[in-house]
């Protein structure tokens, strides 16, 4: 779990560091999204680092609990992040949980490090393309847009693009294979990825 947290966290912190391999392929200096750190104040940098850490914990450590225990775990995780539990390391006397997460649970939001912004998962939905199926679509291959399909597709795509191994677990018949196939076949750029 620790390795998963660190892999995700590192992938989100790439906004501070341009990828030299991509730059070499392009033949020019690639700018990281936030590569000019001198333009950012220390508080903003800390907010991005903290938020990336919280999001990484949420989607590696916190997702190990099943749906019925997410709310209690959310409350516990908030107390840890806010330094409200004695005996647990405090984060230099500062709260690392952003104000944006005051409504709902930590599972309800996605973090965009390049904008230092938290948004509800549902804001990622393209309302024009919701549940438009091909006439010849096979029932078992249809992906109905839900908050879970949005979350899992985003996380899977992010992990694939950052070469982070993933494992989707859960009860039989909950759509794991369909989510994975949907991302592999319909979301990833065809010029970069081939399905074998």
Where are these regions (language model features)?
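AAA+ P-loop NTPase catalytic core
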Residues: 1-196
């Amino acid at each position: 779990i620790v390795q998963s947290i660190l892999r995700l966290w590192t992938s989100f912190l790439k906004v501070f560091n341009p990828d030299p391999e991509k730059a070499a392929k392009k033949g020019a200096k690639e700018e990281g999204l936030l590569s000019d750190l001198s333009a950012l104040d220390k508080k903003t940098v800390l907010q991005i680092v903290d938020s990336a850490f919280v999001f990484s914990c949420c989607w590696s450590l916190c997702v190990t609990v099943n749906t019925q225990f997410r709310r209690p775990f959310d409350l516990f995780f908030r107390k840890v992040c806010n330094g409200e539990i004695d005996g647990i390391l405090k984060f230099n006397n500062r709260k690392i949980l952003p104000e944006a997460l005051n409504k709902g649970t930590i599972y309800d939001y996605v973090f965009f490090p390049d904008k230092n912004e938290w948004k509800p998962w549902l804001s990622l939905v393209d309302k024009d393309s919701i549940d438009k199926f091909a006439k010849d679509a096979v029932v078992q291959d249809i992906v109905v847009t839900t908050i879970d399909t949005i979350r899992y597709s985003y996380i899977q795509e992010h992990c694939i693009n950052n070469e982070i191994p993933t494992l989707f677990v859960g009860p039989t018949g909950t759509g794991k294979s369909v989510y994975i196939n949907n991302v592999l076949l319909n979301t990833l750029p065809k010029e970069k990825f081939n399905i074998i």
